[in-house]
Amino acid sequence: MRHDLHAIFNGCLYIAREGCCWRSLPKVICPPWTVVFWHFQRWSKSALLVQVTHALNEAVRRKKGREMTPSTLIVDAHSLKSRNGGEAIGFDGNKKVHGRKNQVLIDTLGLIWDVHTHAANLSDNYEAVPLFDHFLPLLPRAKQVYFDKGYRGTAVSYLTDLDVASHISDKGVGEKKGGFQPEPLRWRVERTIAWITDCRRLKASFERTISSCEGFAWLTGCYIARGKLVGRKPWAMSKVSVI
């Protein structure tokens, strides 16, 4: 029996957004969960979700009158508690989280351009390097990267060798006595991480494999970019069929 790929993709988005288990997919609007799960595994292990997200990102940038690829990028990480164990699990002593970290690379519009998942006990400074290896061939216009003090050292040296400028923001610098002042550009990646964790499947790591964990992050990237294309706020609730 053949199933509609549109319905299968929406089934994956439903899981990412609602955070339910695979067997709880509503049968009325989605194909059997085994079909949706099989396709999700296949797409996660290939570059398909990455390609779809990048294509949507480029469409958003064209709509806003920007170049197709960004010149300014922002990096940050968010930790996920592991619920089921599996690959690459560690303890983040800083945030007191046992699980994984997602290194996220975005542009100034908040669109996701790369994701790298690793054990939470590994240093951001070293684990950001795979991001740079991935994005530089895909984003030839990249000229500068913003990140916080946790990336000072190896990450900065690596970018310097590639002739990409590094900007490290120091918390507390430039703050006024009147109250909190957001750090220039850095607040955008915090906003994107808030959008990511608004998808319940990414509030914690329920996946046993790295490919599945990154797959849900890329699905969220599709969700954010598609929402910007149709004029929907990324944090707004929507129907299941969003693409």
Predicted regions and their residues:
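Short alpha-helical elements
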Residues: 1-243
